[in-house]
């Protein structure tokens, strides 16, 4: 098996098994499932109660803004962990001040972004 495509064989087998499983599941659901359609089955299910009113409720855009800011700063903070864990390794392999200065610049850019958010009063609820 010196073929250049031989290493892709397990992936192809897994893909075929997955597609086969999906096909068998959908086909058996279609064959064994109930065929009777009624108006009651087309209604929305809301914890056993009949739905009342409009499902569209308006709420403040602040929730989206806070969620976006949380995700933004949370993802950036995730970059701190690998840096902190590997700081000693980087200090031995490269100049330790170089890595420290780069992380300091990264933290400064985060701080500038956070100051911008505060100055724009994005976190004020009034």
Curated annotation (Swiss-Prot):
Catalyses: a quinone + NADH + 5 H(+)(in) = a quinol + NAD(+) + 4 H(+)(out)
Its cellular-component GO annotations read: NADH dehydrogenase complex; plasma membrane
The main location is membrane
Q: Which domain of life is it from?
A: Bacteria
* EC identifiers of the protein: 7.1.1.-
Is Transport one of the keywords? Answer: yes
Q: Which Gene3D superfamilies match?
A: NADH:ubiquinone/plastoquinone oxidoreductase, chain 3
**Transmembrane residues, as ranges?**
11-31, 64-84, 98-118
Q: Which family does it belong to?
A: Belongs to the complex I subunit 3 family.
Q: What is this protein called?
A: NADH-quinone oxidoreductase subunit A
* Organism, scientific name: Cytophaga hutchinsonii (strain ATCC 33406 / DSM 1761 / CIP 103989 / NBRC 15051 / NCIMB 9469 / D465)
* Gene behind this protein: nuoA
